[in-house]
């Protein structure tokens, strides 16, 4: 896999961060500008929908509208067009994620790891964002403003995997996963704060979300449009792939991907075998599927685009661009 990844550091107030993102987009992917700013023409219903989405942002994702407005100003388009064209584009992913709690880590700290699988048609952009009044964070971007995952400067880790992937995306009023992930990174310091934020958050998506904090707490939040299950953990490990496993949500899906079950069982088997280290978690990420999490099936939306690791005590984030079983794709520290 030969692709170019981008790392951006964005600092300043939300509007200036939005403008900087627009400049980066215009420079790196000028063909993508039209995705965000396609005009509505005479379709007044889309304008009204954009206005409604901005109002939802104001309530549930405070501060995000200012970023969108700066982005729109720089591109010379309307904020309503930007929010409509990002919120209505379906995105998902075939991912694996695990958090090891201090009693099961040889370091006595909280260790996190995840891989993200999709096709080669992706943003491939890691961002560090520092906006006054919010937690600074580093994570992979989706549609500029959203996040697939990340670690903030308060020691909170967030990662996601799509759940119930064979079900059609619901048409209920709500956000895609990336808005929830970004808002947790911006606003939360602990697992309990993340659960409190996520519980009422309107979601038009089927999601497995794992959060962990530097105090040795973690939780798996399985969330759909009309139900949510939460499993808290302070010992052992917690993990997820692409299906629901908790009471209250696991009956949601009537069909499951075999590769999701295979990866879920593999992680559990290897994690139970012994206490974990950053190196042992890296081995999970860098061993080829099915006896590992590194995948190369890009034409089937199942190729590893990146892997992340973090030790929440020292706040280090390690990213591998591309599948981790390729020797040239080393982990870099951010």
Provide a role label for each language-model segment.
Residues 4-6, 24, 35-42, 59-176, ...:
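A contiguous strand-loop segment
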Residues 143-148, 168, 191-200, 204-230:
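Structured soluble/peripheral alpha/beta segments that form catalytic or ligand/cofactor-binding pockets
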Residues 117-118, 165, 223-229, 323-326:
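A short, sequence-level motif marking secondary-structure junctions
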Residues 100, 111-112, 159, 208-212, ...:
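A structural signal for short, well-ordered beta-strand segments and their strand-loop junctions
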Residues 54, 167-171, 178-186:
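Flexible, glycine/proline-enriched loop segments at strand-loop-helix junctions
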Residues 1-95, 189-200, 206, 214-218, ...:
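C-terminus-biased signal that marks the final domain/tail of proteins
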Residues 101-108, 152-154, 212-216, 223-227, ...:
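Short acidic-glycine loop/turn motifs at beta-strand connectors
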């Amino acid at each position: 896999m030969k692709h170019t990844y981008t790392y951006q550091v964005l600092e300043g107030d939300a509007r200036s961060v939005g403008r900087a993102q627009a400049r980066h987009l215009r420079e790196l992917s000028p063909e993508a500008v039209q995705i965000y700013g396609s005009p509505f023409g005479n379709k007044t219903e889309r304008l009204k929908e954009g206005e409604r989405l901005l109002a939802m942002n104001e309530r549930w994702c405070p501060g995000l509208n200012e970023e969108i407005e700066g982005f729109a100003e720089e591109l010379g388009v309307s904020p309503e067009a930007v929010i409509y064209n990002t919120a209505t584009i379906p995105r998902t992913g075939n991912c694996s994620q695990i958090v090891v709690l201090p009693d099961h880590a040889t370091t006595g700290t909280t260790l996190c790891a995840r891989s993200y699988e999709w096709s080669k048609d992706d943003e491939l952009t890691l961002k560090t964002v520092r906006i006054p009044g919010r937690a600074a964070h580093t994570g992979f971007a989706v549609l500029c403003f959203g996040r697939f995952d990340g670690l903030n400067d308060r020691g909170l880790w967030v990662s996601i995997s799509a759940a119930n992937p064979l079900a059609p995306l619901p048409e209920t009023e709500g956000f895609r996963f990336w808005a929830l992930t970004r808002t947790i990174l911006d606003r939360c310091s602990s697992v309990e704060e993340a659960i409190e934020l996520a519980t009422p958050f309107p979601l038009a998506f089927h999601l497995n979300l794992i959060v962990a904090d530097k105090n040795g707490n973690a939780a798996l939040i399985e969330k759909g449009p009309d139900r949510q299950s939460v499993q808290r953990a302070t010992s052992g490990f917690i993990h997820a792939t692409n299906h629901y496993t908790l009471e209250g949500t696991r009956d949601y899906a009537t069909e499951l991907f075999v590769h999701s079950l295979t990866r879920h069982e593999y992680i559990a088997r290897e994690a139970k075998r012994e206490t974990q280290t950053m190196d042992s978690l890296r081995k999970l990420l860098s061993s080829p599927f099915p006896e590992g999490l590194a995948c190369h099936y890009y034409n089937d939306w199942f190729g590893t685009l990146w892997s992340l690791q973090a030790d929440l005590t020292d706040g280090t984030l390690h990213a591998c661009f591309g599948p981790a079983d390729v020797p040239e794709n080393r982990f870099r520290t951010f």
